[in-house]
Amino acid sequence: MEIYYHGTSKKFPAFDMAHALEGDGKIKMGAGFYLTTGYKRAAHYSCKSPGSTDFYVYTVEIPDLTPENHIEFKEPVNPIIIRHAEEKLGEPIPLEETTDGKFFRKYIAMKLAGKTGNKKLTPEDEMAAADFLISIGVIYNKVPFIWTKPVVHYDVIVMKPDVMRILKIEQVELAPPRKNAKPELVEGSQREIPLDSLK
């Protein structure tokens, strides 16, 4: 099992895909819940929802990432995943679309939506792609955010929320951002929210 953090302005007892777009509504790296290895990064994410005044960081446990259950930004897609996707689509996937997890995800989304060229994907298209990937055993999308080798700091987009277990919820305070900067966690402001109070 692996431990990550999730920032949000909402309190809830379990993750539900119906609420996956309640942050800023953007899907930059695919549909799902965005977890991160960095606590401070999660705290920053907690203020993404417009008009939010309360901020929370969730400590979350998920099953280990394996070569067969995740795709990764700027990394080739595992051959087993490619084979399962081709079997389900009923046709081969162009080699260039398998050289990067991002290309692969977008190709699947475009194919399912019947779109070509530079047509923009909708949140619904991305959700359909997530459902497709889940059906072939892919439940994570890994995206590094600090590129120093070896890469140890990254975000994980979880497409299948029922694998996520909330271990702890903490309400946090954020300092007003300096000019051209992001809001920052106020160290020591964390206040744990009892999980049984949300049931």
Protein language model features and the residues they cover:
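Glycine-rich phosphate-binding loop of ATP-grasp-fold ATP-dependent ligases
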Residues: 31-33
